[in-house]
Amino acid sequence: MTFTLGMVGAGQFASHFAVLFDKHPGISTLYATDVIPERAQQLVDELDLAGTFPSFEDMLASPDVDAVAIFTQRWTHGPLVLQALQAGKHVYSAVPMATAQTEIESIIQAVQETGLTYMMGETSQYNPATVFARKKAEQGAFGRVFYAEGDYVHDMDLGFYDAYKYSGGDDWKATASYPPMWYPTHAIGGVLGAVPRHATSVSCIGVHDDRGDGVFDTAVSMFDNDYSNMTALFELDGGGSMRINEFRRVGFPSYIRESRFRWFGTDGSFEQLVTNSVWQDRDGVTDVSDQIANRPTMDEDDPRLADVSPALRSSFVSGHAPVHDDLTGRLPAEFDFAPNGHEGSHQLLVDDFVTAVNDGVLPPVNAWQAARYTLPGLIAFESAKRDGARLTIPDQGDAPVAVGERLPAADRVS
């Protein structure tokens, strides 16, 4: 069983996923479209894909396309996802899910009404630390988790200026001010991807940027944002708390590790720094760094990374870690020696989506889970603008079926 897929966006990030979608035997045909047509054509030529569409709308109108994978600028995801679902297409979306609560609610409603597959490609779902902690949580080794931390620590000087210039064109500074808490899913998704909880309230503090270079400047920002660093404390359902840091001006080697996590339970805990990770309980400390160390899939000077800033290339070469070994057996043989990325997550995410569409089952990072990874950050940003006021976070509830189970009947493409 196979389906056809259209790549929406053909930039740096999209091209690396296109390779995997093209290799997966569950996808029969791959197309591309981009607002810069030359990029779509280049992707088609490099991978010998089926062809391009002149626009997103043309792609949605085509009966030759069953599903779309959205890799556009982050503030455009919500409306594009909703448009695709309403056109009858399954959707894979890069993070975040959306930038407004109403968009999130509308996406969930559309998934319920259509029975189509929606999946957000949150890489932290397969971050080695999250995989390790998820296994410990399933074993009951943490006891009751009462506190956790997730940090997405990525300095603007380490590749983000180049990335925003590539995607934003002449007006890149207006978009480079994207609010840090509107990009919360790597940090929140890493924490909640290990423990089945959700945030219920938040108090957030933002640090006003003082670089003075036109980035994070309300006079320029299309988001009216001048926070470059933000810290939020979330209350979790059932008790306990979660601290999330989103830092964009920070002396930290994000090219070594840009996301790091900690979980504390009544029986055990896990802590992570840049180059080491430890499991701790009352009996002592165990260094588990080797279990979550990624194996590279290509060199950072590989020609396929020519358009990627050197400071960002580590995210596109990292393969699986030993802790992934019991997950990779499901991957198709076509992925052997294929590129991976973001700490070994790319191949697993692609396979999750292909399996969900072809089998009609709920993927791990489904619409309801994506909402729990995304909406808390949107509410946190509002809290920061209100001097840290504690705000309630609406929850969209649990998915109607468990992960891996068949979705309710609808006019599915299969």
Segments (PLM) and residue ranges:
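Glycine- and charged-residue-rich phosphate/anionic-cofactor binding loop of Rossmann-like
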Residues: 28-29, 334-338, 355-373
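Beta-strand-loop-alpha-helix segment that lines the small-molecule cofactor/substrate pocket
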Residues: 62, 66-67, 73-74, 78-126, ...
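Glycine-centered short loops/turns at secondary-structure junctions
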Residues: 88, 115, 140, 239, ...
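Predominantly a Rossmann-like dinucleotide-binding segment in NAD(P)-dependent oxidoreductases
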Residues: 124-225
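Contiguous beta-strand/loop segments that form the cofactor/metal-binding neighborhood of enzyme cores
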Residues: 182-307, 339, 346-363, 377-381, ...
